[in-house]
Amino acid sequence: MLRFSTAGESHGESLIALVSGMPAGVPIDQDFVNRELWRRQQGYGRGGRMRIEQDTAHFLSGVRHGKTIGSPIAMEIENRDWKNWTEILPVETGDASKHKAVASPRPGHADLAGALKYDFAEARYVLERASARESTARVAAGAVAKSLLLELGIDVASHVVRVGNVEMERTATWAEIAALRELDEVMLGCVDAETEARMKAEVDRALLTKDTIGGVFEVVVHGAPAGIGTYANWDERLDGVLAQAVMSLQAVKAVEIGRGVTAAASMGSDVHDAIGYAAELPEGAHTRFTRERNNAGGIEGGISNGEDVVVRGYLKPISTLRQPLASVRFDTREETKAAYERSDVCVVPAAGVAAEAMVALAFGRLLLEKFGGDSLRELKRNYDGYLEQIRRF
């Protein structure tokens, strides 16, 4: 089974990503992994931390001579800001006067709930692990999963469809979405220039008012065949697995598959995707069964149906505010303002990149459970045999 875990704190020495269950023989390009980490750091409205960190992954195990070797893959991403925190967050007992307490919890963050759960006197240790800095390690792990999927002709990309009250009013093509990854300068990750300009104005408004702003990103899995996931068991349904994966990201408060939200207010005849059959296999398709639209988001009955898999994540505004909301001090219980920690104003494009990683890891897990294989060659034999089967159906 393809699994991953992460370790590390926001201002600790480094972050660790551990990926296990990866078949042997999968090519790993370190430049590709580092490019994914770079993409996560981009976007208009990011904070000062992104000017400090220049994330790169150092492979500790599991990859030799540019390929996976079947053993767990460990990666380390250095926190360059660590040098400023060595006395604040020492491993050994340190000078208490240098500790930087989070004395008043921030509404919307894990501060209060985490301090109550783990019996902390204040929220510093909660912040350190709950921070979205952890998603850096997820992106590194996701880059490994993407490398596997790409060997099978399956690609994963994202774009931003909404920031604040500005929403893109048309459907993006796969070519437009994929092209965003090639840009060397990222604004807000929207494929429509006019819409992106209005999105930027929304971020500027939040900057001027010392506020934060959320939005919606869309992740697309392109090139996947029908048959990933199952209706047979509740915890193996593809939509459920993807929703949990994306929902686990910091600040994501809702997940949508296909036209999930508006479908609830529509008639069935306007929602469901009629089925056709082509005389010849359409270019890029795995079967002759066709759809003229994709309201289902590529998933029916918990199983991929051969169309692009489309997942949207709804991101709340970042909870650290430069004009803090009312809170209460942990030590005195007196009313005060919430703590402020250096933060971003808008992270929707970066969250989309992190969601790509989670979707790739989740999709890769179900794919390996279906086709198996201790090596890439074995996996490809199994996969190619299945593709031939559904082509002939």
From Swiss-Prot:
Residues holding NADP(+): R40, R46
Keyword Flavoprotein tagged: yes
Pfam families referenced in this protein's UniProt entry, alphabetically: Chorismate_synt
Superkingdom of origin organism: Bacteria
Entry-linked Gene3D superfamilies: Chorismate synthase AroC (3.60.150.10)
InterPro entries, alphabetized: Chorismate_synth (IPR000453), Chorismate_synth_AroC_sf (IPR035904), Chorismate_synthase_CS (IPR020541)
Cofactor(s), by name: FMNH2
Pathway involvement of the protein, from the record: Metabolic intermediate biosynthesis; chorismate biosynthesis; chorismate from D-erythrose 4-phosphate and phosphoenolpyruvate: step 7/7
UniProt KW Flavoprotein keyword: yes
Cofactor binding comment, as recorded: Reduced FMN (FMNH(2)).
Reactions it catalyzes: 5-O-(1-carboxyvinyl)-3-phosphoshikimate = chorismate + phosphate
Alphabetized GO MF terms: chorismate synthase activity; FMN binding
Record-level GO cellular component terms: cytosol
UniProt-annotated binding residues for FMN: R129, A130, S131, Q250, A251, G301, K316, P317, I318, S319, T320, R342
Keyword field: Amino-acid biosynthesis, Aromatic amino acid biosynthesis, FAD, Flavoprotein, FMN, Lyase, NADP
EC number: 4.2.3.5
Biological-process GO terms, alphabetical: amino acid biosynthetic process; aromatic amino acid family biosynthetic process; chorismate biosynthetic process
Oligomer and partners: Homotetramer.
Similarity annotation: Belongs to the chorismate synthase family.
Function in brief: This reaction introduces a second double bond into the aromatic ring system.
Protein name: Chorismate synthase
Organism of provenance: Acidobacterium capsulatum (strain ATCC 51196 / DSM 11244 / BCRC 80197 / JCM 7670 / NBRC 15755 / NCIMB 13165 / 161)
Annotated gene: aroC
